[in-house]
Amino acid sequence: MRMSAAMFSSFRCKTRSSKVMLRRGRKRRRRIEDALVAPEIPLDLLIEILTKLPAKSLMRFKCVSKLWSSLIRSRFFSNCYLTVKTPRRPPRLYMSLVDHLLCNSLMVCHYPCESVLLSSSSSAESLEQNLTIAGMGGRNMVVLRGLILYVVCRTASIYNPTTRQSVTLPAVKSNILAQKSHWNSLLYFFGYDPVLDQYKVVCTVALFSKRLKRITSEHWVFVLEPGGSWKRIEFDQPHLPTRLGLCVNGVIYYLASTWKRRDIVVSFDVRSEEFSMIQGPLKVSAFSESVGFIEYGGKPAVFDYTMMKQTGLVDLWVLEDAGKWSRKSLVLQPCQMHLVDNDIEFNVEGTTQNGEVILAPETIISPYYILFMTSKRMI
Protein backbone atom coordinates (compact mmCIF):
# COMPACT_ATOMS: atom_id res chain seq x y z
CA MET A 1 0.00 0.00 0.00
CA ARG A 2 2.84 2.40 0.79
CA MET A 3 4.42 1.73 -2.61
CA SER A 4 1.15 2.26 -4.34
CA ALA A 5 0.55 5.53 -2.51
CA ALA A 6 4.03 6.75 -3.40
CA MET A 7 3.57 5.82 -7.02
CA PHE A 8 0.18 7.53 -7.09
CA SER A 9 1.62 10.67 -5.50
CA SER A 10 4.46 10.71 -8.04
CA PHE A 11 1.98 10.28 -10.89
CA ARG A 12 -0.13 13.19 -9.64
CA CYS A 13 2.95 15.42 -9.45
CA LYS A 14 3.94 14.49 -12.98
CA THR A 15 0.40 15.18 -14.22
CA ARG A 16 0.33 18.60 -12.54
CA SER A 17 3.75 19.38 -13.97
CA SER A 18 2.62 18.36 -17.44
CA LYS A 19 -0.46 20.60 -17.19
CA VAL A 20 1.67 23.53 -16.06
CA MET A 21 4.10 22.96 -18.92
CA LEU A 22 1.18 22.69 -21.36
CA ARG A 23 -0.31 25.97 -20.14
CA ARG A 24 3.06 27.67 -20.38
CA GLY A 25 3.50 26.32 -23.93
CA ARG A 26 0.08 27.63 -24.95
CA LYS A 27 0.84 31.07 -23.52
CA ARG A 28 4.20 31.10 -25.29
CA ARG A 29 2.59 30.15 -28.64
CA ARG A 30 -0.10 32.77 -28.10
CA ARG A 31 2.55 35.44 -27.56
CA ILE A 32 4.35 34.35 -30.74
CA GLU A 33 1.10 34.37 -32.75
CA ASP A 34 0.21 37.82 -31.42
CA ALA A 35 3.66 39.04 -32.42
CA LEU A 36 3.28 37.60 -35.93
CA VAL A 37 -0.17 39.15 -36.58
CA ALA A 38 0.25 42.46 -38.41
CA PRO A 39 -1.45 45.45 -36.85
CA GLU A 40 -4.58 46.72 -38.60
CA ILE A 41 -3.79 49.23 -41.35
CA PRO A 42 -5.59 52.57 -40.89
CA LEU A 43 -8.23 53.15 -43.56
CA ASP A 44 -6.69 56.41 -44.79
CA LEU A 45 -3.31 54.74 -45.23
CA LEU A 46 -4.90 51.73 -46.95
CA ILE A 47 -6.68 53.98 -49.46
CA GLU A 48 -3.48 55.91 -50.13
CA ILE A 49 -1.61 52.67 -50.84
CA LEU A 50 -4.31 51.14 -53.04
CA THR A 51 -4.78 54.25 -55.19
CA LYS A 52 -1.15 54.04 -56.26
CA LEU A 53 -1.44 50.47 -57.53
CA PRO A 54 -2.17 49.39 -61.13
CA ALA A 55 -5.74 48.48 -61.98
CA LYS A 56 -4.88 44.81 -62.53
CA SER A 57 -3.51 44.55 -58.99
CA LEU A 58 -6.67 46.10 -57.57
CA MET A 59 -8.80 43.48 -59.32
CA ARG A 60 -6.74 40.73 -57.65
CA PHE A 61 -6.80 42.39 -54.23
CA LYS A 62 -10.60 42.27 -54.14
CA CYS A 63 -10.15 38.64 -53.06
CA VAL A 64 -8.17 39.57 -49.93
CA SER A 65 -11.23 40.24 -47.77
CA LYS A 66 -14.79 41.52 -47.86
CA LEU A 67 -13.56 44.88 -46.57
CA TRP A 68 -11.05 45.26 -49.40
CA SER A 69 -13.59 44.12 -51.98
CA SER A 70 -16.26 46.60 -50.84
CA LEU A 71 -13.69 49.39 -50.61
CA ILE A 72 -12.24 48.86 -54.10
CA ARG A 73 -15.74 48.56 -55.62
CA SER A 74 -17.04 51.72 -53.89
CA ARG A 75 -17.72 54.97 -55.73
CA PHE A 76 -15.63 56.85 -53.15
CA PHE A 77 -12.54 54.81 -53.97
CA SER A 78 -13.15 55.19 -57.71
CA ASN A 79 -13.18 58.97 -57.33
CA CYS A 80 -9.97 58.87 -55.29
CA TYR A 81 -8.33 56.60 -57.85
CA LEU A 82 -9.20 58.95 -60.71
CA THR A 83 -7.75 62.01 -58.96
CA VAL A 84 -4.38 60.45 -58.13
CA LYS A 85 -1.67 61.15 -60.69
CA THR A 86 1.13 58.64 -60.86
CA PRO A 87 3.74 57.81 -63.50
CA ARG A 88 2.78 54.15 -63.19
CA ARG A 89 -0.32 54.77 -65.27
CA PRO A 90 0.75 55.73 -68.81
CA PRO A 91 -1.97 57.18 -71.04
CA ARG A 92 -3.70 54.65 -73.26
CA LEU A 93 -5.09 55.01 -76.74
CA TYR A 94 -8.26 53.05 -77.53
CA MET A 95 -9.45 52.18 -81.00
CA SER A 96 -12.38 50.13 -82.21
CA LEU A 97 -12.14 47.99 -85.34
CA VAL A 98 -15.59 47.30 -86.80
CA ASP A 99 -16.22 44.87 -89.63
CA HIS A 100 -19.52 46.47 -90.68
CA LEU A 101 -19.42 50.15 -91.58
CA LEU A 102 -23.18 50.69 -91.59
CA CYS A 103 -23.72 49.57 -88.01
CA ASN A 104 -24.01 52.90 -86.20
CA SER A 105 -26.55 54.92 -84.27
CA LEU A 106 -28.17 56.56 -87.29
CA MET A 107 -29.14 53.39 -89.15
CA VAL A 108 -30.95 50.21 -88.21
CA CYS A 109 -28.50 47.31 -88.37
CA HIS A 110 -29.96 44.15 -89.90
CA TYR A 111 -26.71 42.17 -90.01
CA PRO A 112 -24.63 40.96 -87.09
CA CYS A 113 -21.26 42.61 -86.76
CA GLU A 114 -18.34 42.32 -84.39
CA SER A 115 -15.55 44.61 -83.33
CA VAL A 116 -12.37 44.41 -81.34
CA LEU A 117 -11.46 47.10 -78.83
CA LEU A 118 -7.71 47.62 -78.83
CA SER A 119 -5.61 49.71 -76.49
CA SER A 120 -2.03 50.87 -76.68
CA SER A 121 0.28 52.66 -74.28
CA SER A 122 2.90 55.22 -75.26
CA SER A 123 4.90 52.43 -76.88
CA ALA A 124 3.81 51.78 -80.45
CA GLU A 125 4.91 48.16 -80.11
CA SER A 126 2.50 47.49 -77.24
CA LEU A 127 -0.99 46.60 -78.44
CA GLU A 128 -3.47 44.75 -76.26
CA GLN A 129 -6.84 43.33 -77.19
CA ASN A 130 -9.17 44.39 -74.39
CA LEU A 131 -12.58 43.17 -75.39
CA THR A 132 -14.48 41.62 -78.26
CA ILE A 133 -18.03 42.93 -78.39
CA ALA A 134 -20.71 42.16 -80.93
CA GLY A 135 -21.18 45.31 -82.99
CA MET A 136 -19.26 47.78 -80.83
CA GLY A 137 -19.32 51.01 -82.84
CA GLY A 138 -16.28 53.20 -83.20
CA ARG A 139 -17.85 56.48 -84.34
CA ASN A 140 -20.20 57.17 -81.47
CA MET A 141 -17.94 56.60 -78.47
CA VAL A 142 -17.87 59.05 -75.54
CA VAL A 143 -15.29 58.86 -72.75
CA LEU A 144 -16.07 60.27 -69.30
CA ARG A 145 -14.05 59.75 -66.10
CA GLY A 146 -12.65 56.41 -67.20
CA LEU A 147 -15.93 55.03 -68.61
CA ILE A 148 -16.75 54.62 -72.31
CA LEU A 149 -20.26 55.09 -73.73
CA TYR A 150 -20.66 53.38 -77.11
CA VAL A 151 -23.67 52.93 -79.36
CA VAL A 152 -24.53 50.06 -81.68
CA CYS A 153 -27.75 49.90 -83.68
CA ARG A 154 -29.33 52.60 -81.52
CA THR A 155 -28.57 50.76 -78.28
CA ALA A 156 -26.23 52.35 -75.73
CA SER A 157 -23.75 50.47 -73.55
CA ILE A 158 -21.24 51.49 -70.87
CA TYR A 159 -17.80 49.87 -70.85
CA ASN A 160 -15.33 50.01 -67.95
CA PRO A 161 -11.77 49.48 -69.27
CA THR A 162 -10.47 48.83 -65.75
CA THR A 163 -12.79 45.94 -64.93
CA ARG A 164 -13.41 45.07 -68.60
CA GLN A 165 -17.12 44.87 -67.93
CA SER A 166 -19.86 46.17 -70.21
CA VAL A 167 -23.48 47.02 -69.34
CA THR A 168 -26.16 47.52 -72.01
CA LEU A 169 -28.92 50.04 -71.32
CA PRO A 170 -32.55 49.23 -72.16
CA ALA A 171 -33.95 50.57 -75.41
CA VAL A 172 -35.68 53.95 -75.47
CA LYS A 173 -39.42 53.63 -76.10
CA SER A 174 -39.76 56.74 -78.24
CA ASN A 175 -42.86 57.71 -80.19
CA ILE A 176 -40.64 59.18 -82.89
CA LEU A 177 -38.79 55.93 -83.50
CA ALA A 178 -42.14 54.16 -83.84
CA GLN A 179 -42.88 56.29 -86.92
CA LYS A 180 -41.66 54.86 -90.21
CA SER A 181 -39.40 57.58 -91.58
CA HIS A 182 -35.87 57.77 -92.97
CA TRP A 183 -35.45 61.30 -91.63
CA ASN A 184 -34.81 60.61 -87.98
CA SER A 185 -31.78 60.48 -85.71
CA LEU A 186 -30.85 59.25 -82.26
CA LEU A 187 -27.84 60.41 -80.25
CA TYR A 188 -26.69 59.63 -76.72
CA PHE A 189 -24.79 61.99 -74.39
CA PHE A 190 -22.89 61.09 -71.22
CA GLY A 191 -22.81 63.33 -68.14
CA TYR A 192 -21.61 63.37 -64.54
CA ASP A 193 -22.82 65.42 -61.57
CA PRO A 194 -19.91 65.98 -59.12
CA VAL A 195 -22.21 67.20 -56.34
CA LEU A 196 -24.54 64.18 -56.19
CA ASP A 197 -21.86 61.86 -57.60
CA GLN A 198 -24.20 60.57 -60.32
CA TYR A 199 -23.71 59.45 -63.91
CA LYS A 200 -26.53 60.09 -66.37
CA VAL A 201 -27.10 59.25 -70.02
CA VAL A 202 -29.19 61.64 -72.13
CA CYS A 203 -30.87 60.44 -75.33
CA THR A 204 -32.20 62.90 -77.91
CA VAL A 205 -34.45 61.53 -80.65
CA ALA A 206 -35.33 63.82 -83.57
CA LEU A 207 -37.65 63.59 -86.58
CA PHE A 208 -36.95 66.15 -89.30
CA SER A 209 -37.88 67.06 -92.86
CA LYS A 210 -35.64 67.96 -95.76
CA ARG A 211 -33.71 71.22 -95.24
CA LEU A 212 -34.96 71.21 -91.63
CA LYS A 213 -38.23 72.97 -92.38
CA ARG A 214 -39.83 70.88 -89.64
CA ILE A 215 -38.23 69.29 -86.56
CA THR A 216 -39.71 67.24 -83.73
CA SER A 217 -37.54 66.03 -80.86
CA GLU A 218 -37.83 63.99 -77.66
CA HIS A 219 -35.41 63.85 -74.73
CA TRP A 220 -34.82 61.00 -72.29
CA VAL A 221 -32.60 60.66 -69.20
CA PHE A 222 -31.21 57.48 -67.63
CA VAL A 223 -29.54 57.50 -64.18
CA LEU A 224 -26.79 54.89 -63.89
CA GLU A 225 -27.89 53.08 -60.76
CA PRO A 226 -29.44 49.70 -59.89
CA GLY A 227 -32.97 49.50 -61.27
CA GLY A 228 -32.50 52.60 -63.44
CA SER A 229 -34.93 53.36 -66.26
CA TRP A 230 -35.49 55.98 -68.95
CA LYS A 231 -37.38 59.12 -67.94
CA ARG A 232 -38.70 61.62 -70.47
CA ILE A 233 -37.69 65.28 -70.03
CA GLU A 234 -39.77 68.06 -71.59
CA PHE A 235 -38.07 70.79 -73.65
CA ASP A 236 -40.10 73.11 -75.87
CA GLN A 237 -37.31 73.89 -78.38
CA PRO A 238 -37.19 71.17 -81.07
CA HIS A 239 -33.70 70.66 -82.49
CA LEU A 240 -31.50 68.18 -84.33
CA PRO A 241 -28.16 67.27 -82.67
CA THR A 242 -25.29 67.30 -85.16
CA ARG A 243 -22.30 66.30 -83.02
CA LEU A 244 -21.45 64.10 -80.08
CA GLY A 245 -21.53 66.05 -76.84
CA LEU A 246 -19.17 66.62 -73.94
CA CYS A 247 -19.60 67.14 -70.21
CA VAL A 248 -17.91 70.09 -68.48
CA ASN A 249 -18.43 70.84 -64.76
CA GLY A 250 -21.69 68.93 -64.51
CA VAL A 251 -23.19 70.29 -67.75
CA ILE A 252 -23.61 68.44 -71.06
CA TYR A 253 -23.06 70.50 -74.23
CA TYR A 254 -23.67 69.55 -77.85
CA LEU A 255 -24.02 71.24 -81.24
CA ALA A 256 -27.45 71.24 -82.86
CA SER A 257 -29.61 72.95 -85.48
CA THR A 258 -33.14 74.27 -85.19
CA TRP A 259 -35.73 75.27 -87.74
CA LYS A 260 -34.18 76.63 -90.98
CA ARG A 261 -30.70 75.49 -89.90
CA ARG A 262 -30.10 77.93 -87.09
CA ASP A 263 -26.93 76.63 -85.41
CA ILE A 264 -27.00 76.47 -81.62
CA VAL A 265 -25.30 74.88 -78.62
CA VAL A 266 -27.64 72.96 -76.32
CA SER A 267 -26.72 72.67 -72.64
CA PHE A 268 -28.18 70.20 -70.16
CA ASP A 269 -27.61 70.55 -66.41
CA VAL A 270 -27.02 67.00 -65.18
CA ARG A 271 -28.23 67.69 -61.63
CA SER A 272 -31.35 69.79 -62.30
CA GLU A 273 -32.09 68.01 -65.62
CA GLU A 274 -32.90 71.31 -67.36
CA PHE A 275 -32.15 72.27 -70.97
CA SER A 276 -31.11 75.65 -72.36
CA MET A 277 -29.94 77.00 -75.72
CA ILE A 278 -26.97 79.19 -76.70
CA GLN A 279 -26.44 80.81 -80.08
CA GLY A 280 -23.48 79.21 -81.86
CA PRO A 281 -20.65 81.08 -83.64
CA LEU A 282 -22.18 82.87 -86.62
CA LYS A 283 -19.34 81.96 -88.99
CA VAL A 284 -19.44 78.23 -88.27
CA SER A 285 -21.91 75.68 -89.62
CA ALA A 286 -22.91 72.87 -87.30
CA PHE A 287 -23.34 70.61 -90.35
CA SER A 288 -19.83 71.14 -91.70
CA GLU A 289 -17.73 67.97 -91.78
CA SER A 290 -14.66 70.03 -90.86
CA VAL A 291 -16.03 71.17 -87.51
CA GLY A 292 -15.41 69.48 -84.18
CA PHE A 293 -16.81 70.09 -80.71
CA ILE A 294 -14.20 69.78 -77.95
CA GLU A 295 -13.29 70.85 -74.42
CA TYR A 296 -10.60 73.54 -74.33
CA GLY A 297 -9.32 74.96 -71.04
CA GLY A 298 -12.30 73.59 -69.13
CA LYS A 299 -14.80 75.20 -71.53
CA PRO A 300 -16.77 74.01 -74.58
CA ALA A 301 -15.17 75.02 -77.88
CA VAL A 302 -15.87 74.70 -81.60
CA PHE A 303 -12.83 73.53 -83.58
CA ASP A 304 -13.18 74.74 -87.19
CA TYR A 305 -10.49 73.26 -89.46
CA THR A 306 -12.21 73.98 -92.80
CA MET A 307 -9.16 75.86 -94.14
CA MET A 308 -6.48 73.72 -92.51
CA LYS A 309 -5.40 71.95 -95.72
CA GLN A 310 -5.37 75.11 -97.86
CA THR A 311 -3.84 77.67 -95.49
CA GLY A 312 -2.81 75.73 -92.37
CA LEU A 313 -5.20 77.90 -90.34
CA VAL A 314 -7.56 76.56 -87.67
CA ASP A 315 -10.17 78.65 -85.83
CA LEU A 316 -10.99 77.82 -82.24
CA TRP A 317 -14.20 79.33 -80.85
CA VAL A 318 -14.34 79.11 -77.04
CA LEU A 319 -17.63 79.53 -75.16
CA GLU A 320 -17.05 82.13 -72.45
CA ASP A 321 -19.37 83.33 -69.70
CA ALA A 322 -22.77 84.82 -70.58
CA GLY A 323 -22.93 82.78 -73.79
CA LYS A 324 -20.25 84.80 -75.63
CA TRP A 325 -17.66 83.32 -77.99
CA SER A 326 -13.98 84.19 -78.16
CA ARG A 327 -11.93 83.34 -81.26
CA LYS A 328 -8.39 81.96 -81.30
CA SER A 329 -6.35 81.02 -84.35
CA LEU A 330 -3.93 78.12 -84.62
CA VAL A 331 -1.45 78.10 -87.50
CA LEU A 332 0.51 75.13 -88.82
CA GLN A 333 4.15 75.64 -89.67
CA PRO A 334 5.24 75.12 -93.31
CA CYS A 335 7.18 72.01 -92.28
CA GLN A 336 3.93 70.52 -90.91
CA MET A 337 1.72 71.02 -93.95
CA HIS A 338 2.64 67.64 -95.45
CA LEU A 339 0.89 65.98 -92.51
CA VAL A 340 -2.52 67.27 -93.67
CA ASP A 341 -2.47 65.91 -97.21
CA ASN A 342 -5.40 66.89 -99.43
CA ASP A 343 -6.31 63.24 -100.01
CA ILE A 344 -6.79 62.54 -96.29
CA GLU A 345 -9.94 63.50 -94.42
CA PHE A 346 -9.54 64.02 -90.68
CA ASN A 347 -12.03 63.78 -87.83
CA VAL A 348 -11.77 65.49 -84.45
CA GLU A 349 -11.79 62.76 -81.81
CA GLY A 350 -11.60 64.98 -78.71
CA THR A 351 -8.81 66.30 -76.50
CA THR A 352 -6.25 64.84 -74.12
CA GLN A 353 -5.87 65.78 -70.45
CA ASN A 354 -3.12 68.19 -71.52
CA GLY A 355 -5.46 70.06 -73.88
CA GLU A 356 -4.14 68.56 -77.12
CA VAL A 357 -6.74 68.22 -79.89
CA ILE A 358 -6.79 64.71 -81.40
CA LEU A 359 -7.14 64.50 -85.19
CA ALA A 360 -7.43 61.04 -86.78
CA PRO A 361 -7.85 60.01 -90.44
CA GLU A 362 -11.43 59.18 -91.37
CA THR A 363 -10.42 55.98 -93.17
CA ILE A 364 -7.67 53.43 -92.60
CA ILE A 365 -4.51 54.42 -94.46
CA SER A 366 -0.92 53.24 -94.47
CA PRO A 367 0.88 54.59 -92.60
CA TYR A 368 -1.90 55.43 -90.16
CA TYR A 369 -0.97 58.34 -87.91
CA ILE A 370 -2.81 60.52 -85.41
CA LEU A 371 -2.16 64.24 -84.96
CA PHE A 372 -2.06 65.93 -81.56
CA MET A 373 -2.49 69.68 -81.98
CA THR A 374 -2.08 72.43 -79.38
CA SER A 375 -2.04 76.21 -79.48
CA LYS A 376 1.77 76.09 -79.60
CA ARG A 377 2.66 73.10 -81.74
CA MET A 378 1.45 69.97 -83.49
CA ILE A 379 2.93 66.57 -82.61
From Swiss-Prot:
Q: Which organism is it from?
A: Arabidopsis thaliana
Recorded hits in InterPro entries, A to Z, give:
F-box-assoc_dom_typ3, F-box-assoc_interact_dom, F-box-like_dom_sf, F-box_dom
What residues does the F-box domain cover? 35-84
Record-linked SUPFAM superfamilies: F-box domain (SSF81383)
Domain of life the protein comes from: Eukaryota
The molecule here is called: Putative F-box protein At5g62660
Write down the NCBIfam families for this protein, in alphabetical order.
F_box_assoc_1
**Pfam family of this protein, just one?**
FBA_3
